[in-house]
Amino acid sequence: MNMFFRLTALAGLLAIAGQTFAVEDITRADQIPVLKEETQHATVSERVTSRFTRSHYRQFDLDQAFSAKIFDRYLNLLDYSHNVLLASDVEQFAKKKTELGDELRSGKLDVFYDLYNLAQKRRFERYQYALSVLEKPMDFTGNDTYNLDRSKAPWPKNEAELNALWDSKVKFDELSLKLTGKTDKEIRETLTRRYKFAIRRLAQTNSEDVFSLAMTAFAREIDPHTNYLSPRNTEQFNTEMSLSLEGIGAVLQMDDDYTVINSMVAGGPAAKSKAISVGDKIVGVGQTGKPMVDVIGWRLDDVVALIKGPKGSKVRLEILPAGKGTKTRTVTLTRERIRLEDRAVKMSVKTVGKEKVGVLDIPGFYVGLTDDVKVQLQKLEKQNVSSVIIDLRSNGGGALTEAVSLSGLFIPAGPIVQVRDNNGKVREDSDTDGQVFYKGPLVVLVDRFSASASEIFAAAMQDYGRALVVGEPTFGKGTVQQYRSLNRIYDQMLRPEWPALGSVQYTIQKFYRVNGGSTQRKGVTPDIIMPTGNEETETGEKFEDNALPWDSIDAATYVKSGDLTAFEPELLKEHNARIAKDPEFQNIMKDIARFNAMKDKRNIVSLNYAVREKENNEDDATRLARLNERFKREGKPELKKLDDLPKDYQEPDPYLDETVNIALDLAKLEKARPAEQPAPVK
């Protein structure tokens, strides 16, 4: 679900259809619950600890030194910006930092819960202070600055230092709204709602939130890709992997205290009803034979849990239509199995002159991906495309089996990836069918967010000489995770009152290319590297403080299905000539230069209105000029101001456009080359 918060002017009290909906403000610290472990958490902690210490690839001792590291990670997860807790708070609990291993083994998580409860109290105090700051006159004429990233800053020594940090935070929030054109009155109203909303959320925190954070600190200290998944996150994970769920087919978001329809899945129950529209608010949820439950002010995940249910069952929604002065209405929907098509492979065809290039955009390696790609390749074959692009940008991976089977569509047979466990045992995962589903020119487009299964596929295509890889160096995740439920068959017999216990993902293996190299930390280096607008940002495995190291093993025995190295000089020459003249890439290069010039200052922003307005005006002027240059090239009328830009305007994708050109060049070169006999590689 999409759980971001939009700030709009909504009345805190609405009289609707004869009912009064109100959400109580939290004005005292004692209204925030003191959170304690639930009965099942001790057992879950014991099972998680046992699983990680016995089975994780990185063999570690849960000793005092490791416990101290868990404490530090938990502390930073709890107060990332170091602007909630005091240094004395940290020192108070640091005395017990070496005891966390014992707590995890026993399941008695006192330090985790006590520290969380203190942070809740401190966070309440901070937002109460922020509300008091709003009453002061606003002054944006000084030389104050605001640090956007305090993750490495020391914790404040006293309340005066803490107040100074929040003076700057409130001033930053005020100035951000003032730059949008809001009046001082509107700014105060908006921020008052925002801060009170944050306080109400404190009162909705539950024991599972604390437990999840504790387990996350433990898991992430072992390596970046080891996770504890709460029962609800486990359900979400299964949905992502299968691309299906049972529900009403709507994406929800929070808007102050309201659950709002953000979008609807075409063909789903919500869309088919024609009684629900984007922007409508869900104020009540009712199950068959049960009264309607008022959900105003509820956590989004709690509302979602009420709405979802088995296929064929009914759910009643009390809907407040978008707009003012409207009455609620009740809509009854029958839940269905919903396929999340927006996460499935998408096919498109790019036409350049008389040539066509097929593009397969793959957002993730879900179960069933290979079968879906086969269908799309058949469609592309009917359109007589000259080449195919596999777009793996922002693809974070997924099922290892799908990476292997997808690779098998493009080579006759052979190993795709080598997998090694922590005992040194190496396994080859291979394609064995001896068939090639697509034999034409192939290009793989990647970026720094292409990870894991994406890197397995890209590396295999590169090592076999089957495809040209273009884009950015990839993320560098070269590890394999295993997913295990924490439930036991006997749990429901012995403890029927327990909910589901969640699951864990933990690293059990590292994978290696067929050439023996690892993608861990280094990723896959493209044959043609594209310039990007955010050069050297801290994205990738190598920036994780506890990532497993890079290493290599012996190469597998495999038969290359092609060799594109002879083409690379010509392809690179044509590519460089094009982007040197391409206005979009010229702008990208300017952005790179600007980013690099400002990278040491990018987290420090001015709190002076004139300075920020000048910066914003310059940015707007640059964007408007670039848009008008583009429109002029396209023969479209120029814009007078940015507000005239249509809301549905689609920005061009210069990286994909250039990849299409590279694919056409590759197709021409391959067509002109005589067939060669492949040779085995050892």
Curated annotation (Swiss-Prot):
Annotated phenotype, changing K477 to A/H: Loss of activity. No apparent effect on protein structure
Phenotype upon changing G397A: Loss of activity. Perturbs protein structure
SUPFAM superfamilies assigned: ClpP/crotonase, PDZ domain-like
One of the protein's GO biological processes: signal transduction
Family matches, as SMART domains: PDZ, TSPc
Domain called PDZ: residue spans: 238-322
Signal peptide: 1-22
GO cellular component, one term: outer membrane-bounded periplasmic space
Reaction(s) this enzyme catalyzes, per UniProt: The enzyme shows specific recognition of a C-terminal tripeptide, Xaa-Yaa-Zaa, in which Xaa is preferably Ala or Leu, Yaa is preferably Ala or Tyr, and Zaa is preferably Ala, but then cleaves at a variable distance from the C-terminus. A typical cleavage is -Ala-Ala-|-Arg-Ala-Ala-Lys-Glu-Asn-Tyr-Ala-Leu-Ala-Ala
Region (Disordered): 635-654
UniProt GO molecular function: endopeptidase activity; serine-type endopeptidase activity
Active-site residues, Swiss-Prot/TrEMBL: S452 (charge relay system), D463 (charge relay system), K477 (charge relay system)
Resulting phenotype, D463A: Loss of activity
Class of enzymatic activity (EC top level): hydrolase
Membrane topology label: Peripheral membrane protein
Protein's cellular compartments: Cell inner membrane
InterPro entries: ClpP/crotonase-like_dom_sf (IPR029045), PDZ (IPR001478), PDZ_sf (IPR036034), Peptidase_S41A (IPR004447), Tail-specific_protease (IPR005151), Tail_Prtase_C (IPR020992), TSP_N (IPR040573)
UniProt keyword annotations, A-Z: Cell inner membrane, Cell membrane, Hydrolase, Membrane, Protease, Serine protease, Signal
Record's compositionally biased regions (Basic and acidic residues): 635-650
A Pfam family that the UniProt record links to this protein: DUF3340
PROSITE patterns, per the entry: PDZ (PS50106)
Entry function: Involved in the cleavage of a C-terminal peptide of 11 residues from the precursor form of penicillin-binding protein 3 (PBP3). May be involved in protection of the bacterium from thermal and osmotic stresses.
Protein family membership: Belongs to the peptidase S41A family.
Protein name as annotated: Tail-specific protease
Organism listed in the record: Escherichia coli (strain K12)
